């Protein structure tokens, strides 16, 4: 990635955002949030929700960058949308590891509206990168993304429960409202960057889980 950054120097993340916008031919603005989406393009990944909500998404003051490959119907849909909304939406319909890293590091938010997701890695990457995830509450997403609570100011992302495009838009709007409050937003970013996904921690959790299961039998 163009610029390394940490929870202590979040400003450097903007260097990656600028590079990302330029790479995809979008006009860079610090104030306009970029929503990243890296996914296999299938219904199970919630792409039908994205398709259904697309016009509403394009009405928001955002830019969306998608990388992925999959179902032909989604390839043709996103190709059409990229030519219809060239200032707001860009896509790379294939896989490219370097671009995937740049999207993770340069986006402000990461969208993962999966129908089901046994584990999910992209939300973990995005948390580590300080790219705030907006996910559906399912499987591994529910385990790793904690819905931000405005009263307690705790949480590391945004979560919607019902598999529904309106619910997804509603939670996205809540995230975008908080994006305008830089202090709160950086708090959410830092909360995600502090999460430890190392195998050591995961292994300990599994061992505890097995002990619990065995002792209850």
What are these regions (language model features)?
Residues 1-217:
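Catalytic cores of carbohydrate-active enzymes across secretory and cytosolic contexts
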């Amino acid at each position: 990635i163009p610029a390394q950054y940490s929870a202590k120097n979040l400003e450097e993340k903007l260097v990656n955002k600028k590079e990302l916008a330029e790479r995809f031919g979008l006009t860079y603005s610090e104030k306009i949030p970029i929503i990243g989406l890296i996914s296999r393009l299938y219904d199970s990944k919630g792409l039908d929700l994205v398709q259904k909500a697309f016009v509403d998404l394009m009405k928001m003051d955002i830019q969306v960058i998608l990388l992925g490959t999959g179902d032909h119907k989604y390839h043709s849909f996103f190709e059409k949308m990229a030519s219809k909304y060239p200032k707001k939406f860009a896509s790379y319909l294939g896989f490219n590891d370097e671009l995937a890293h740049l999207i993770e590091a340069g986006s402000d938010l990461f969208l993962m509206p999966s129908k089901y997701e046994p584990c999910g890695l992209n939300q973990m990457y995005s948390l580590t990168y300080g790219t705030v995830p907006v996910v559906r509450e399912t499987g591994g997403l529910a385990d790793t993304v904690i819905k931000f609570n405005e009263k307690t100011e705790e949480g590391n992302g945004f979560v919607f429960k019902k598999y529904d495009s309106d619910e997804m838009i509603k939670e996205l709007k809540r995230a975008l409202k908080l994006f305008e409050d830089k202090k709160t937003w950086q708090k959410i970013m830092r909360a995600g960057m502090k999460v430890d996904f190392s195998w050591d921690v995961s292994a300990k959790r599994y061992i505890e889980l097995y002990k619990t299961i065995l002792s209850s039998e």
